[in-house]
Amino acid sequence: MFDVVISDIEAREILDSRGYPTLCVKVITNTGTFGEACVPSGASTGIKEALELRDKDPKRYQGKGVLQAISNVEKVLMPALQGFSVFDQITADAIMIDADGTPNKEKLGANAILGVSLALAKAAANTLQRPLYRYLGGSFSHVLPCPMMNLINGGMHATNGLQFQEFMIRPISAPSLTEAVRMGAEVFNALKKILQNRQLATGVGDEGGFAPNLASNAEALDLLLTAIETAGFTPREDISLALDCAASSFYNTQDKTYDGKSYADQVGILAELCEHYPIDSIEDGLAEEDFEGWKLLSETLGDRVQLVGDDLFVTNSALIAEGIAQGLANAVLIKPNQIGTLTETAEAIRLATIQGYATILSHRSGETEDTTIADLAVAFNTGQIKTGSLSRSERIAKYNRLMAIEEEMGPEALFQDSNPFSKA
């Protein structure tokens, strides 16, 4: 068993949920076992994320092809890894990082490297005939995460004029992951009927949430409260609200304002929303470059609301350490494709957890049927996950995988929300 090595690595171009190309990578061992992984892609991206390599050939997919990334997998990474143990994830990831040789993986592409990294872990798990979460986390991995369900899409994930990007619900009173999914689905369908009755659009955005034309962020939150109550649940007690402001998308870097408002105004807006609505989590409430704004937000709300850094940290351990030292945020969003390897993803989770920051495993707006992040959330006991709404198969696939894991674990499974400010 211990001489199972990488014999081949294949990559192919597939489409993500937005109809853009991405990679599917297959790592094959000398025993015939293999693992496959598909790489997601973001629309709202942090400026310090690892680079997603695109061909920039206007004759194919408006320049978004990934043939060069595929070539890098097969002609650079495969020869570099061929013959190495399928179980030595850390060494394999280090070899790929060295082969790239750039701080943001711009030479070979984080999409190429991540595809190999995740497929390698799956190949190892399949070789041992273990589920991925158990292979990576061992016997101590038993926490099923509380989902953040994106029911109304705005910002860069829709074309409806809403300033904030995600308006989410968190089923905090659920006794299990399966019940949390049921609660979310019932609120989702209640919201759909409410929108229909008000003659509002029920088309969905990139992450499966509805994207109606609304006048304000508050109107979106009011709709969520109505849907929660219509579905038979009590806001705050059963289901809380969460926001992803994606504030960098409406931040003016020249005059350092948010749609003409100062960072103090932006913090005031968020504080007022938290007074009027059962919000217990806010992601990217300030722009990634606005450290003064983040400091004020953390001082103002950090003792009663989960403040999640996404663009602020981009799953980068160095940036997380810097933010912790400055007292910015109190939670970290974890997106494997922001950093580019499984090893670095695990390091980011470990660092945040040691420092008392909550972690949330997250999808991207451009997703595939790949369910790896569900296993990662359980493997690393993150206690929270963001994987979209209760529609679109690329989102539902992750929920279905989590429910399967919960059933497989039986009484060992523990549904646990890692948000310390949860009202449940």
UniProtKB/Swiss-Prot annotation:
SUPFAM superfamilies registered for this protein in UniProt: Enolase C-terminal domain-like (SSF51604), Enolase N-terminal domain-like (SSF54826)
Binding site for (2R)-2-phosphoglycerate: Q165, K335, R364, S365, K386
Pfam families, per database record: Enolase_C, Enolase_N
Residues that bind Mg(2+): D244, E283, D310
Top-rank taxon: Bacteria
BP GO terms, sorted: glycolytic process
EC number of this enzyme: 4.2.1.11
Entry GO terms, CC: cell surface; extracellular region; phosphopyruvate hydratase complex
Annotated keywords: Cytoplasm, Glycolysis, Lyase, Magnesium, Metal-binding, Secreted
Molecular function terms from GO: magnesium ion binding; phosphopyruvate hydratase activity
Gene3D superfamilies documented for this protein: Enolase-like C-terminal domain, Enolase-like, N-terminal domain
Pathway: Carbohydrate degradation; glycolysis; pyruvate from D-glyceraldehyde 3-phosphate: step 4/5
Stretch forming the signal peptide: none
Cofactor note: Binds a second Mg(2+) ion via substrate during catalysis.
The reaction(s) this protein catalyses: (2R)-2-phosphoglycerate = phosphoenolpyruvate + H2O
Active site residues per record: E207 (proton donor), K335 (proton acceptor)
HAMAP family according to UniProt: Enolase (MF_00318)
Role description: Catalyzes the reversible conversion of 2-phosphoglycerate (2-PG) into phosphoenolpyruvate (PEP). It is essential for the degradation of carbohydrates via glycolysis.
Protein name: Enolase
Species this protein is from: Chlamydia trachomatis serovar D (strain ATCC VR-885 / DSM 19411 / UW-3/Cx)
